[in-house]
A protein has these predicted regions:
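Extreme N-terminal, non-catalytic leader segments
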Residues: 1-13, 36
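NTP-dependent small-molecule kinase module
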Residues: 2-4, 146-147, 161-218
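Conserved lysine of the Walker
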Residues: 24
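Short glycine-/polar-rich loops that comprise or flank the Walker A/P-loop
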Residues: 36-38, 120-125, 167-169
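Short beta-strand-centered segment that lines the nucleotide-binding/catalytic pocket of NTP-utilizing
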Residues: 36-49
Length: 218
């Protein structure tokens, strides 16, 4: 069997989830900056565009009828309604990227991850990022100085339910040191790429094996 080739492999879907404040955003931003051949999946949303946002960069902003048509027609891999606005992952760009050997990064919650599992489980490598302690999570949320005390309290309550789903992920990363956690995330990506390349080579080998067996058995 030939050596695994990155150009021959199918792309992978790297799914990263965490409670707010665990460091997921920093880790994924660094990954996109330092790794090649991986892009962040851009969601569609029905909410209004904020002044600082760029259509096609932060989100694809669409009207509700278009979103409904995509959802009902199987055009979304996952979707959710949040505070009266709908968000979803378009199917076609992801499938095209994977077929071309390009990896896709998903920054979504456990509910979105479940939907992705149902759609394309064989392509997914999932990672759940945990804080080193409850106290540290609270400190990180407070240090950001972005949210009121009520919102921080709500995020901490939400973290309880979110963390309860850690067993649904392929990998769990305790983010107690950013550099070490980032190195681990890069290794998880590298391992996923290698396995995908090995599957591609194995598929070619098995196809030839079956062809030869059919010829011999005829």
């Amino acid at each position: 069997m030939s050596a695994a080739s990155d150009t021959a492999r199918r792309g992978i879907m790297l799914v990263v989830s965490s409670p707010s404040g665990a460091g997921k955003t920093t880790l994924t931003r660094n990954l996109l900056a330092q790794e090649q051949n991986i892009s962040l999946s851009i969601s569609v949303t029905t909410r209004a565009r904020r002044p600082s946002e760029i259509d096609g960069v932060h989100y694809h902003f669409i009207a509700m009828p278009e979103f409904t048509a995509m959802r009902d027609g199987g055009g979304l891999l996952e979707w959710a309604e949040v505070h009266g606005n709908c968000y979803g992952t378009p199917r076609k760009p992801v499938e095209a990227a994977l077929a071309a050997g390009h990896d896709m990064l998903f920054d979504i919650d456990w509910q979105g991850t479940r939907q992705l599992y149902q759609a394309m489980r064989q392509d997914i490598v999932s990672v759940f990022v945990l804080p080193p302690s409850a106290a540290e999570l609270k400190t990180r949320l407070e240090r950001r100085a972005e949210d009121s005390a009520d919102i921080i309290a709500r995020r901490l309550r939400n973290a309880i339910e979110e963390i309860a789903h850690w067993t649904e992920y392929d990998h769990v990363l305790i983010n107690d040191d950013l550099d070490r956690s980032f190195a681990t995330l890069r290794q998880i990506l590298a391992d996923g790429r290698r396995k995908s390349a090995q599957r591609a080579d194995l598929a070619d080998f098995i196809a030839k094996l079956l062809t030869d067996l059919r010829r011999i058995a005829a």
